[in-house]
C-alpha cells in the first residue's frame, strides 16, 4: 500500500492554552468547518466531540488529550486537543513531545494567563513552532492590541499580528488580513458566509502601519526580502508568507491571528494559517536518538527507513483494552507485525492499528513516517519508550515529567474492593506518569500522589466509575521532599559472615547538591576497584534508599552521587551486598551533608475588586506568601505571588468569604524551596 498523502502535506499540531480560553471550542469548530463532523457540540453543554470522558462532560473542562484527523486544502492534519488546567499538564507535555506545531489560544479579555506561560515554556523546550490565536473577540472586555502586548511582555517573543479585528465585543464582525490587505465580514455566526469587502476607512491607516511592521519583521529573517524592502521594491504576498513560514518553523516568529471560535469567526483563516505556516514532518529538524554506542544520530522522516516510533501515551479503552499512542518518526508499521521495546529489550506484537477520533477508533492496515496512531496489543510499553524493528537499537529522547505535589490516603470500603483497587491504581499509574501510588511504611496505608486536588479527585472518580471500586479518602497532604545542602565523601560497607558464603560490598561515594537537576549518578571507578557488574546495583541501591530521606522519611531529590572508590571480595560480593552498601553510604551522608526539607511553592494569580485589594494582600502575606507584582485590569486588581502549597488548603473558601464571592484565583506549581525551620520542626513532630 503506497502513501496516500505526501509527507510534506502532513501537519501534526496541538491546541494549547490556559483553562477557559476556548481550546476545545476551537477544536470543535475546526472539525466542523473541515467537514469532519456535521453538528457542533458545545463544551458548556457537555456535548463536544473532543471532551468525551464523563468527567469532562460534567465539569466542562478537558482532562485528557484527545486526537483526531481532518483534511484541509489537500493536507492531512493530525490534531491533538490538550487540557488547560495545570493539574493535567502531563497531557500537554507528552503531546508537545511528538507534535511538529501548535496553536496557542488566548482569551482576548485576559491575554496571557499563568497556564499560557507554562504551556509556552513546555513548547519552547521541545522547540515546537507556534501560531497564536486571540480567541473570544466577541467577549466583553476583549482587546486585541492589549493581548498582543501581553504576549510580547509576558512571553518575551516576537509576536506579530497578521490579522486585525474589525470591532470588538458585540461589535466584532470581521477580520482584516494584514498580508493581503483584505477585509472579511461575517454574516451572523456562519463563517461560510464571510464576505470580502474593502477595508473600512477608519482602519486603513492602522492596517498600513501593521503591514509595514510585518514586512520589517519578516525582512529581518530573509536577506532577499530585506534587500527588496530597502530598495523600495514591492513585496510579493508569497514572499511574505514564505518568510513567515520560515520564521515560524525556526521558532523566531510567532504570527498572531484573531477570531471567535464560539461565533464561528476566523476558524477557516486559522486553518489556512496551519497549512501555510506550521511545518510538515520534513520541515522540522530530524529527531535525535542515541544508538547502542551512546552516540547521537539523526532520524530522518522517510518511509524507506527502518521503523522507529515513540510511545507518548497509554490509555485504557473499555472495549479493546490497552491503547498505546505512537508517533512514527521513520519507516512503516503494519498491523500484525512485531516491534522491539528498546529500553526493555522486549518484542511485542502489534495486534491492530487504529486512527482515533476522540474516543472512536478507525482501524487501519499500516502507519507511515510522520503520522500518529494508536496501537492495540502492546502490554508492556509505557509512556516515553522507543519502539523499533529488529534491525534498530536506538532510543529517542525520553520525556521529563513533574513530580507530584499533593497526596492523600485511600482505602477500600470492603474486602472485595481491595484487589480491584490495586488493579485500578496500577492501570491509572500506567496511563499517567505524574500519578504515583505507594504504601506508607509506617501506617500501611495506600497513598496516591498527583499534581493537585482536582487531579486526585478525577482519578478517585475514575476508580469508582471505570473500575467499580468504592474507596474512602483521607485529607490531602503536601508532598514534601528532602535533599542535601552540602558536599561530603562517605563510605558504605556491608560485610556479613555467618558460615558458608558471606556478603561483601564496599563503596566510597561523594554526595553533593544538584539543584533542580534531579538525581544524577556518576561512575568514576577506575582500575577495576569495583567490577562493572556491581556498578548498576550501587545506583539502584541509592535510588531505592532515596525513597525515604533522613529528616522525615520523604523522598529525596536533586542529589549528585559520584562513586569514586570501593572494594570487593572474589567470593562474597554480590549485587545485593552492593545495593545495601550504597544505602548505608546514603544513610551516613544524611548525617554529614546537612539535609533539608523542601516544600512545593505555588505561583498564584488572584483577581479581586479594588475594595478587597488590601485584605487579599494581607491574607497572602499571612500564608508565608511573597508578592511578586500587582496589575490594574479594568476595574479589578491582579496580584501575583508565590505561596507554599501547605498554606493554600482552604484558600478558595477564604477568598470567597472576604471578597464577597467576587474574587477568584489560579494556582500552579512553581518550584521546591527549603522549608523554614519552625515549619520543619512541626512536620517532623507530626510524623512521629
Curated annotation (Swiss-Prot):
Compartment annotation: Cytoplasm
Function: Catalyzes the GTP-dependent ribosomal translocation step during translation elongation. During this step, the ribosome changes from the pre-translocational (PRE) to the post-translocational (POST) state as the newly formed A-site-bound peptidyl-tRNA and P-site-bound deacylated tRNA move to the P and E sites, respectively. Catalyzes the coordinated movement of the two tRNA molecules, the mRNA and conformational changes in the ribosome.
GO biological process: ribosome disassembly
Annotated keywords: Cytoplasm, Elongation factor, GTP-binding, Nucleotide-binding, Protein biosynthesis
Name under which the protein is recorded: Elongation factor G
GO molecular function, one term: translation elongation factor activity
Keyword Nucleotide-binding: yes
Protein family: Belongs to the TRAFAC class translation factor GTPase superfamily. Classic translation factor GTPase family. EF-G/EF-2 subfamily.
Pfam families noted in UniProt: EFG_C, EFG_III, EFG_IV, GTP_EFTU, GTP_EFTU_D2
Annotated InterPro entries: EFG_II, EFG_III, EFG_III/V, EFG_IV, EFG_V, EFG_V-like, EFTu-like_2, G_TR_CS
Binding locations of GTP: 17-24, 81-85, 135-138
SUPFAM superfamilies referenced in this protein's UniProt entry, alphabetically: EF-G C-terminal domain-like, P-loop containing nucleoside triphosphate hydrolases, Ribosomal protein S5 domain 2-like, Translation proteins
Ranges where the tr-type G domain occurs: 8-282
Source organism of this protein record: Mycoplasma genitalium (strain ATCC 33530 / DSM 19775 / NCTC 10195 / G37)
GO cellular component, one term: cytoplasm
Domain of life, source organism: Bacteria
Name of encoding gene: fusA
Amino acid at each position: 500500500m503506497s502513501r496516500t498523502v505526501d509527507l510534506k502535506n502532513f501537519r501534526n499540531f496541538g491546541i494549547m492554552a490556559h483553562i477557559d480560553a476556548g481550546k476545545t471550542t476551537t477544536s470543535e469548530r475546526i472539525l466542523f468547518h473541515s467537514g469532519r463532523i456535521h453538528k457542533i457540540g458545545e463544551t458548556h453543554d457537555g456535548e463536544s466531540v473532543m471532551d468525551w470522558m464523563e468527567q469532562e462532560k460534567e465539569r466542562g473542562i478537558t482532562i485528557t488529550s484527545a486526537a483526531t484527523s481532518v483534511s484541509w486544502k489537500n493536507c492531512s492534519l493530525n490534531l491533538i486537543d490538550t487540557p488547560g488546567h495545570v493539574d493535567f499538564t502531563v497531557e500537554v507535555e507528552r503531546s508537545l513531545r511528538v507534535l511538529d506545531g501548535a496553536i496557542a489560544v488566548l482569551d482576548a479579555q485576559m491575554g496571557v494567563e499563568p497556564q499560557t506561560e507554562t504551556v509556552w515554556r513546555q513548547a519552547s523546550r521541545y522547540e515546537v513552532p507556534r501560531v497564536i490565536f486571540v480567541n473570544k473577540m466577541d467577549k466583553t472586555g476583549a482587546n486585541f492590541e492589549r493581548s498582543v502586548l501581553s504576549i510580547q511582555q509576558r512571553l518575551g517573543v516576537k509576536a506579530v499580528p497578521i490579522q486585525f479585528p474589525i470591532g470588538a465585543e458585540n461589535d466584532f464582525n470581521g477580520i482584516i488580513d494584514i498580508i493581503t490587505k483584505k477585509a472579511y465580514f461575517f454574516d451572523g455566526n456562519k463563517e461560510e458566509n464571510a464576505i470580502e469587502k474593502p477595508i473600512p476607512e477608519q482602519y486603513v491607516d492602522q492596517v498600513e502601519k501593521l503591514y509595514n511592521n510585518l514586512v520589517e519583521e519578516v525582512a529581518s529573517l530573509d536577506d532577499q526580502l530585506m534587500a527588496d524592502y530597502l530598495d523600495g521594491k514591492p513585496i510579493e504576498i508569497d514572499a511574505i508568507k514564505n518568510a513567515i513560514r520560515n520564521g515560524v518553523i525556526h521558532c523566531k516568529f510567532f504570527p498572531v491571528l484573531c477570531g471567535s471560535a464560539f461565533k464561528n469567526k476566523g476558524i477557516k483563516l486559522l486553518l489556512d494559517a496551519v497549512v501555510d505556516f506550521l511545518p510538515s514532518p520534513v520541515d522540522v529538524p530530524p529527531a535525535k536518538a542515541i544508538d547502542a554506542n551512546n552516540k547521537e544520530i539523526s532520524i530522518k522522516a522517510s518511509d524507506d527507513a527502518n521503523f522507529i516510533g515513540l510511545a507518548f501515551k497509554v490509555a485504557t479503552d473499555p472495549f479493546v483494552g490497552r491503547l498505546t499512542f505512537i508517533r512514527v518518526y521513520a519507516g512503516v508499521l503494519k498491523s500484525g507485525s512485531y516491534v522491539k521495546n528498546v529500553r526493555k529489550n522486549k518484542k511485542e506484537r502489534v495486534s491492530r492499528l487504529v486512527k482515533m477520533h476522540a474516543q472512536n477508533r478507525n482501524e487501519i492496515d499500516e502507519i507511515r513516517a510522520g503520522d500518529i496512531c494508536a496501537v492495540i496489543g502492546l502490554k508492556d510499553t509505557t509512556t516515553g519508550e522507543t519502539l523499533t524493528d529488529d534491525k534498530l537499537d536506538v532510543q529517542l529522547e525520553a520525556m521529563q515529567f513533574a513530580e507530584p505535589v499533593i497526596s492523600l490516603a485511600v482505602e477500600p470500603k470492603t474486602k472485595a474492593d481491595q484487589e480491584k483497587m490495586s488493579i485500578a491504581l496500577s492501570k491509572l499509574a500506567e496511563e499517567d506518569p505524574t500519578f504515583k501510588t505507594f504504601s506508607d511504611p509506617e501506617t500501611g496505608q495506600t497513598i496516591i500522589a498527583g499534581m493537585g486536588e482536582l487531579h486526585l479527585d478525577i482519578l478517585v472518580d475514575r476508580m469508582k466509575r471505570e473500575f467499580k471500586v468504592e474507596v474512602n479518602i483521607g485529607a490531602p497532604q503536601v508532598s514534601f521532599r528532602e535533599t542535601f545542602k552540602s558536599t561530603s565523601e562517605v563510605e558504605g560497607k556491608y560485610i556479613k559472615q555467618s558460615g558458608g558464603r558471606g556478603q561483601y560490598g564496599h563503596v566510597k561515594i561523594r554526595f553533593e547538591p544538584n539543584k533542580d537537576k534531579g538525581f544524577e549518578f556518576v561512575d568514576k571507578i577506575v582500575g577495576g576497584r569495583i567490577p562493572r557488574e556491581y556498578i548498576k546495583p550501587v545506583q539502584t541501591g541509592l535510588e531505592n534508599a532515596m525513597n525515604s530521606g533522613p529528616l522525615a522519611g520523604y523522598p529525596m531529590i536533586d542529589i549528585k552521587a559520584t562513586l569514586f572508590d570501593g572494594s570487593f571480595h572474589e567470593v562474597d560480593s554480590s549485587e545485593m551486598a552492593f545495593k545495601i552498601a550504597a544505602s548505608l553510604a546514603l544513610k551516613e551522608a544524611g548525617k554529614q551533608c546537612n539535609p533539608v526539607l523542601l516544600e512545593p511553592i505555588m505561583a498564584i494569580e488572584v483577581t479581586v475588586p479594588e475594595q478587597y485589594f488590601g485584605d487579599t494582600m494581607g491574607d497572602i502575606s499571612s500564608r508565608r506568601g511573597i508578592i511578586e507584582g500587582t496589575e490594574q485590569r479594568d476595574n479589578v486588581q491582579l496580584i501575583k505571588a508565590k505561596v507554599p502549597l501547605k498554606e493554600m488548603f482552604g484558600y478558595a473558601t477564604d477568598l470567597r468569604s472576604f471578597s464577597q464571592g467576587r474574587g477568584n484565583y489560579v494556582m500552579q506549581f512553581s518550584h521546591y524551596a527549603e522549608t523554614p525551620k519552625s515549619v520543619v520542626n512541626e512536620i517532623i513532630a507530626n510524623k512521629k
